[in-house]
Amino acid sequence: ARYVLMDSWFTYPATVTKLSGYLPVIGMVKKTEKVLYGFDGQWLNLKAIYRRVRKKPGRAQVLASTVVRLKKGPAAKLVFVRERHTRNWLALLSTATDLEAADVVRIYGKRWDIEVFFKMAKQHLKLTKEIQCRDFDALIAHTSIVFLRYMFLSFECRLSADQRTFGDLF
């Protein structure tokens, strides 16, 4: 893995600081008054930083980005993006400050595929309900079988729906 992708439940300065010593962290950030970031010589919350940062005009996906300092931690890039179908904004944090804002958004978007996979595995492939045991090896075997089911289904879906898999037929 090249990055640690985190949901807003886990993207707090202490966690980010600890993990960033091993891998760069990219995560969604909550709009809370309690978490402060170093910006222009002051410690401000996310909403205050958003008000002060210069936004891009028009309907751009990335509204703004800026580099901030985490308390007792590294520098981080905040990327403000437009929330779909609303006038609201969301904030992403990346400890890889050299990444472009669009790359931060693209990399964080990969997390959504992981969420879809686990929802599918739990709802339709019985990841959590098909087995009840206390043996670690049995749990690993069950999880492996569920993952295999998912791979077979996604492979079949790609064969039947993706035009790129038809080969020389067309």
Q: Across the structure, where does each feature detected by a protein language model lie?
A:
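Single, function-defining residue in the core of a domain
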Residues: A1-F170
